[in-house]
Amino acid sequence: MKKILLAFTLPLVLASQTAMADVTLKVPGNFEILAAQHLEIKKATKIVALPEGDQQVLVRFDSPTNPHSTGQSMGYVSSQPILIRFSANDGEVVKLVAPRVDTQQDVKRFAKNPSFELTDTAGKSVSFESEKLVVSGSPLMANYNDILAVQVAASTKQTLPQPAVITASSQSVSTVDINQLTPAQADQLMKDLYQNADKKSRKEFIRWALGL
């Protein structure tokens, strides 16, 4: 009887220990997790369990236009997805901590340029990098798992200098030496710069390219 009981309880204990050992990522009520590198997320969530190690996760700010309204008749305001890169050990609970947003003006302003930090189980800051992605089309139709997969693949190739990132303590801008790039790399870099530029910069780029 004891052997039978052990056979049933041991897998449950091991499964429980495995679940407890996962890295847990939590976001506040006005943020949501869209995609994670090591698992497929079918619906945006506020909490997710991740394996130990390096993480790449897509999140976004998503708040009622009026943060104090119960009916939400004014709709929601969302930011562009933000790619977060960080590392964590088994058993850690990593929390995304953002400043308080109280007014409609604050919500709209914050959605354009979200700011936050990551903390660990002890409440200490977790080092991370973040990059705001520009996704065209309707957010409802976007496949964020595919979008993240493209970013993960690009980061592993390392054929081109990485885009500027915002860290927990500083903001840096990558410097590119065009002379060190192959023609194919230079062509791809020009395409990336054009696609990520705003309308004004694109017009100036076209005028420069045409010699106007």
UniProtKB/Swiss-Prot annotation:
Keywords: Signal. This is UPF0319 protein PBPRA2789. PANTHER family: UPF0319 PROTEIN YCCT (PTHR38108:SF1). Coiled coil: none annotated. The keyword Signal applies. Belongs to the UPF0319 family. Residues 1-21 form the signal peptide. It comes from the Bacteria. Pfam families: DUF2057 (PF09829).
